[in-house]
């Protein structure tokens, strides 16, 4: 089928966000634009919310914002104009220091208490130090033990750590305590929500005062029976030029592909996709791709010919 709209990828302009734990790689290694060169924690690569509204960098929609496309060109996204919010947020995170230990609510809790969507997220590890570990889940047997260990600040005993390597992939469900640790750089695909309950911030100060914790809400939503272990980490092992699905949840699907030569993957979802070029460079149906680019693949667009030497991750929302 295909309408006049659906014949090109729509590239988005990344926006950097300052964070006290951020580094300088987003500017120096990814080439993203910023006036400063430290504490650059997050690249909001494809974003459509009150904080950042991604802008199209080239082509037919150049200069338009994602919110405008979402509202005015629903067919690009394979949907009706139904007043719902853009579903996903794509970030690259550069943690020079540890991020706070945190947890996110699910949709039900967030809608009731925050008038927001909940936050499910997942991580594709782009870089990390040797022997890196992420904090995912806890060792608490039940809610009473969790409460006691938090009150007594027994963080080392409480927090579960999992080893990770470059190229690993991890799903973080709402209710699972988690933290990105110093030195890790990752691609995050998440629900379009910013509701975070901070449990522990290493007693750090920001402008002389500790950042606020949200222990009560955190206790409400922490899932103590989550079974997170080393087996929860996916080690993608696909051959070159073969698309590999990393995860399928009720909110999104994520795939990765390493292209070396030519790959043809066609259409891989019934909605639109968001593509992120994580390594290398090449072309997709003639359009140039290089590391650090993020783009919308319109509904009905077919990824017929991806060529070059590059890795791309794709995310698709699941429409409810
Ligand atoms: Zn999080």
Protein language model features and the residues they cover:
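Transition-metal
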Residues: 1-141, 203-229, 254
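Ligand-binding loop in jelly-roll beta-barrel domains
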Residues: 85, 93-98, 107, 118, ...
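His/acidic/aromatic-lined binding-pocket segments of jelly-roll/cupin-type domains
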Residues: 90-91, 99, 121-124, 161-162, ...
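Intrinsically disordered, low-complexity linker/loop segments enriched in Gly/Pro
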Residues: 107, 118, 127-161, 165-166, ...
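Double-stranded beta-helix
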Residues: 136-157, 186-228, 315-320
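Short acidic-glycine-tyrosine-enriched beta hairpin
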Residues: 159-171, 285-303
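C-terminal amphipathic alpha-helical segment
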Residues: 197-269
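Short beta-strand segments in beta-sandwich/barrel cores
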Residues: 263-264, 279-284
